[in-house]
UniProtKB/Swiss-Prot annotation:
Substrate binds at residues 69, 98, 127, 163, 185-187, 226-229, 265, 292. Keywords: 4Fe-4S, Iron, Iron-sulfur, Lyase, Metal-binding, S-adenosyl-L-methionine, Thiamine biosynthesis, Zinc. Signal peptide: none annotated. GO terms for molecular function: 4 iron, 4 sulfur cluster binding; carbon-carbon lyase activity; zinc ion binding. The lineage of its organism: Bacteria, Bacillati, Bacillota, Clostridia, Eubacteriales. Catalyzes the synthesis of the hydroxymethylpyrimidine phosphate (HMP-P) moiety of thiamine from aminoimidazole ribotide (AIR) in a radical S-adenosyl-L-methionine (SAM)-dependent reaction. Pathway: Cofactor biosynthesis; thiamine diphosphate biosynthesis. The gene is thiC. This is Phosphomethylpyrimidine synthase.
Length: 432
């Protein structure tokens, strides 16, 4: 193999096995896909050590992907439950899974997740640093932060969130421009604290070239984290967020010079009317790199329903340029999600992604809806269930409320418009 990364292969004119797989699944020309990867507009997160991976592409012209977050915390450290969540995520067709474990030594869970998961696996190495070294945050050295990155890469992690954009300049901008909710990124807040405690530059920014060497070695895709993403609609599109985005655009070019694949992470909480301009800003400032957004959540007042606030924003974001949606569950801001919370979050994100794909004209997107509409016209319940995004729920609702006649439902009964139009157009009367 005469290439280190998917990007290097693409730039050398090589169509890799991973590119062929993605092109087939996405119904796109492999040569065109290779060009987009060479330009940095599409990534295929595919660590060389992730043997169970079924590769997927993220970026321009492809189906909008969704990510599921899970992992152990100090208060909830049941590895078995988190692995069960991973199995559910795979069953519900999540495209990626991020292990956000932030308590104890996490190698066992991470390795088991990578071993079982055909979906791309991501991590945030800075979360793991404190537990891995058993030190106070202030005492962790820059070299030790990089050591955790290498450990995750060796284990087979496909993409890593690296908060390199909150450098001293970005931090100074944040201090000069007060925010309602300060820094809400967990990794961003840890690095800001480390910088303040030590009076030093962000180690991931200062040693970005060394970071790139690790990522190139294992073909880890860097997901450049948005430490200054807005945590409230009031803080959206402010000086800190835009300053960091400019830095991320500069870091993107540096990564591409080393043939390292890059995604950009984005907001966050944001009013509806600011979503489309933000998608344009990211694509402009970050040179067309794939955009990975958390939501955006379009209002702050719906705890318990943030899978809905996120799906609303996610659909608009993806229709106007975002490529990758991080799911949000009803438990957001409240607790670690349960299996049922996860399912609701995944389904909501998949709805948002699919709605955006229809708008973008992604191959195959509209055809799925046309097949469903045909099944509805024919009152073919089994076909409707097969095509449903959540077949189990559709079947359960139908079974729980049985109509008098099989060709109706309990909403309209024999006044069903679809049934009666079928009968009238075939020459029969509406009753019978």
């Amino acid at each position: 193999m005469n290439y280190a990364t998917q990007m290097e292969a693409a730039r050398k004119g090589i169509i890799t096995r991973e590119m062929e797989t993605v092109a087939r699944k996405e119904m796109v020309d492999p040569a065109k896909l290779r060009e987009l990867i060479a330009e940095g507009r599409v990534v295929i997160p595919a660590n060389k050590n992730h043997a169970s991976l079924d590769p997927c592409g993220i970026g321009q012209g492809l189906r909008t992907k969704i990510n599921v977050n899970l992992g152990v915390s100090r208060d909830c450290c049941n590895i078995g439950m988190e692995l069960e969540k991973a199995r559910l995520a795979i069953e519900l067709k999540a495209d990626a899974i991020m292990d956000l474990s932030c308590y104890g030594r996490t190698e066992e869970f991470r390795r088991r997740l990578i071993e079982m998961s055909p979906a791309a696996v991501g991590t945030v190495p800075v979360y793991d640093a404190v537990g891995f070294y058993g030190k106070e945050l202030k005492e962790i050295s820059a070299e030790e932060f990089l050591g955790v990155v290498e450990k995750h890469a060796q284990d087979g992690v496909d993409f890593m969130t690296i908060h390199a954009g909150i450098n001293r300049e970005t931090a100074a901008r944040f201090k000069k421009n007060p925010r309602l909710t300060n820094i809400v990124s967990r990794g961003g807040s840890l690095l800001f604290a480390w910088m303040e405690l030590n009076g030093r530059e962000n180690p991931f920014y200062e040693y970005f070239d060394e970071l790139l060497e690790i990522c190139r070695k294992y073909d880890v895709t860097i997901s450049l984290g948005d430490a200054c993403r807005p945590g409230s609609v009031k803080d959206a599109t402010d000086a800190s967020q835009i300053q960091e985005l400019i830095v991320l655009g500069e870091l993107t070019k540096r990564a591409w010079e080393k043939d390292v694949q890059v995604m950009i992470e984005g907001p966050g909480h944001m009013p509806l009317n600011e979503i489309i301009p933000n998608m344009l800003l990211e694509k402009k400032l970050c040179h067309g790199a794939p955009f990975y957004v958390l939501g955006p959540l379009v209002t702050d007042v719906a705890p318990g329903y943030d899978h809905i606030t996120s799906a609303i924003g996610g659909a608009i974001a993806a229709a106007s340029g975002a490529d990758f949606l991080c799911y949000v569950t009803p438990a957001e801001h409240l607790r670690l999600p349960t299996l049922e919370d996860m399912k609701e979050g995944i389904i909501a994100s998949r709805i948002a992604a699919h709605a955006a794909d229809i708008a973008k004209g992604v191959p195959g997107a509209r055809q799925w809806d046309d097949k469903m509409s045909e099944a509805r016209r024919n009152l073919d319940w089994q076909k409707m269930f097969e095509l449903a995004l959540d077949p189990e729920k559709a079947r359960r609702y139908r079974a729980e409320s049985q109509p008098e006649s099989e060709d109706t439902c309990t909403m309209c009964g024999k006044m069903c418009a679809v049934r009666n139009m079928n009968r009238v157009l075939s020459g029969a009367g509406p009753d019978g």
